[in-house]
Amino acid sequence: MSRAKVGINGFGRIGRLVLRAAFLKNTVDVVSVNDPFIDLEYMVYMIKRDSTHGTFPGEVSTENGKLKVNGKLISVHCERDPANIPWDKDGAEYVVESTGVFTTIDKAQAHIKNNRAKKVIISAPSADAPMFVVGVNENSYEKSMSVVSNASCTTNCLAPLAKVIHDKFEIVEGLMTTVHSFTATQKVVDGPSSKLWRDGRGAMQNIIPASTGAAKAVGKVIPALNGKLTGMAFRVPTPDVSVVDLTCRLGKGASYEEIKAAVKAAASGPLKGILEYTEDEVVSSDFVGSTSSSIFDAKAGISLNNNFVKLVSWYDNEFGYSCRVVDLITHMHKVDHA
């Protein structure tokens, strides 16, 4: 079977890391990149050098006005309007929409206008696009779907863990907190915020309470949990890696040892590569560059009794998520060409 040909719109943190993930996983071919704010030479520099993930482990250069990455040529475009990006010229069927701007079906379909591309994968939650978390509900994808969402990095961490716990012990209700590294939407120093006032406070100086729809979104990918989970976030002064705290009430009583055993079995079985299990004395920096969606920290969780537990799971909110974008495209291509 041929491999999926991919275009990337928006060459920010996720766009660049999807490119890295594509070359690491080697299951799709990136053939085109569009960003109106970054020229070709600057793209080379930004691919090569990353303050968090280090130097790109390969060769990056230019050739005849194109990017050349590990010997493969990638076309570069600088269009502001998605409808004007010539994805078809490069053979890009699947477009990763990673600008953070075109996150609804209507806006994202501009990539498909005039038969430019065939499918769009939004690298963010969407108000109306079907949402998928690899390892949880990707098998509900149908080839008739033209625009889909890869959900959020936090939903990708929480949903696999919640699935294991709910399938085995039944989650009656739960609250999630994500202790989340700062992102580009925050301020380096205090400044005005277009949303909540405290979102505008200096990211590297503060622990900032914030909202997140990640827990509620689990109900979209696991319908049995719809209305049973909600959550909030604390933005903290670290550049990458975040951690989910899921506190939940169980319908079927279980000791913490039984819960650990269930997660460990899933991590080495049906969710291998998605959910990971560790009993090491870990801290956040240990997971920079992790390709897993969710790393269960067996030593960090606690239980009050057999029906009330706190579970802890880590995730590289940048690279782990980017790997799932590539995995989702790979799955879509397989279904589309079955």
Swiss-Prot record:
PROSITE patterns named among the record's database cross-references:
GAPDH
Its GO biological process annotations read: glucose metabolic process; glycolytic process
Keyword NAD part of the UniProt annotation: yes
Q: Which CDD domains match?
A: GAPDH_I_C, GAPDH_I_N
> Enzyme class, one word?
oxidoreductase
Name the Pfam families for this protein: Gp_dh_C, Gp_dh_N
Q: Matching SUPFAM superfamilies, A to Z? A: Glyceraldehyde-3-phosphate dehydrogenase-like, C-terminal domain, NAD(P)-binding Rossmann-fold domains
Q: One GO molecular-function annotation for this sequence?
A: glyceraldehyde-3-phosphate dehydrogenase (NAD+) (phosphorylating) activity
- Tell me the compartments it is located in: Tegument membrane
Q: What is its EC number?
A: 1.2.1.12
**What pathway does the UniProt record associate with this protein?**
Carbohydrate degradation; glycolysis; pyruvate from D-glyceraldehyde 3-phosphate: step 1/5
Its chief place of residence is: membrane
Q: Where are the transmembrane segments?
A: none
Q: Which residues form the active site?
A: C153
Q: Which SMART domains match?
A: Gp_dh_N
Task: Give the catalysed reaction(s), semicolon-separated.
Answer: D-glyceraldehyde 3-phosphate + phosphate + NAD(+) = (2R)-3-phospho-glyceroyl phosphate + NADH + H(+)
Sequence positions that bind NAD(+): R13, I14, D35, R80, S123, N317
List the GO terms this entry assigns under cellular component, sorted alphabetically: cytosol; membrane
Source domain of life: Eukaryota
Claim: Membrane is one of the keywords in the record: yes
Keywords from UniProt, A to Z, are: Glycolysis, Membrane, NAD, Oxidoreductase
Q: What does this protein do?
A: This antigen is associated with human resistance to schistosomiasis.
Q: Which family does it belong to?
A: Belongs to the glyceraldehyde-3-phosphate dehydrogenase family.
Assembly and interaction partners: Homotetramer.
Name listed for the protein in its UniProt record: Glyceraldehyde-3-phosphate dehydrogenase
| Species whose genome carries this gene | Schistosoma mansoni (Blood fluke)
**Taxonomic placement:** Eukaryota, Metazoa, Spiralia, Lophotrochozoa, Platyhelminthes
